[in-house]
Amino acid sequence: MTTDTITTTTETTGTPGNPVLHASGVTMRFGGLTAVRDVELTVNSGEIVGLIGPNGAGKTTFFNCLTGLYIPTEGTVSYKGKVLPHKSHLVTQAGIARTFQNIRLFANMTVLENVLVGRHTRTNEGLWSALLRLPSFKRAERASEERAMELLEFTGLAGKRDHLARNLPYGEQRKLEIARALASEPGLLLLDEPTAGMNPQETRAAEELIFAIRDQGIAVLVIEHDMRFIFNLCDRVACLVQGEVLVEGSPATVQGDERVVAAYLGTPFEGAPGAEEAAEVNAAEASAEAAAAEAAETADEPPADAPADAPSASTKDDTSTTGTTGTTGTTGSEGDSK
């Protein structure tokens, strides 16, 4: 099956079931910087969940905590009720796969070989079996190749199985990353900006592909900045701001939340993460401006021991100018009278 023949429409929704992923109190600090703070998020089976937020909100850092690339400073990540280990290959083996914000393919390997790499956690043959080319290894190799070809059919890349990955168009490289992730037979697929850099046609194809993945019973958690794409695709959306979950709910709820709009436009709002610090900065700036204005006024005032009728420097300038102008004006008037 290719994405051109997928009949799933954007109105199709999954039937959310039991929790697949549960992040509890996940916090990630880098020295004195808290990139992710006390995040709670659940993804259910048969569900597509979107994670949005401004640049630097901590979305990819949160993904890295989920997949074992980072060890959270605090909190736990559970998959199907079991706490995940802090090693990425064990997370993949447990049933979580991901793609990356920047494409990470093996550029000099073929399309088929890239997908076969994703099968390594699902084969049990060891080093000696591979070196000696034992019958069990050959059977596993054939099974992996058959499954890889099924995934290439599914993503519409079967006709390019022998092409080098670097020679694929950008949109097809994104599809290949998804096919490689699916090769590990995940129960949860994490997509980090899957439509970044795509044109509208490629974006629509990616949307159809994700719906088809969901229809196969795979839960999806997706980061994306294309709001039209995310609100059309997801059953539920969470907005992350400065490392904290600001709001979570249906696409319509999140889309209509003024706090989400304010977070994207950079307008502080009451109760926002970092709003208190922003208010302190604004107050300090206002105080500094007031002090500067007061200092300027003090500089224009005459000294305390100066005669009361002594004009200040600025007054003298004004008087001089006025006097000159007045004299000129008077002289001119007298000339006119004469």
Residue ranges and their predicted role:
Residues 267-338:
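ABC ATPase nucleotide-binding domains
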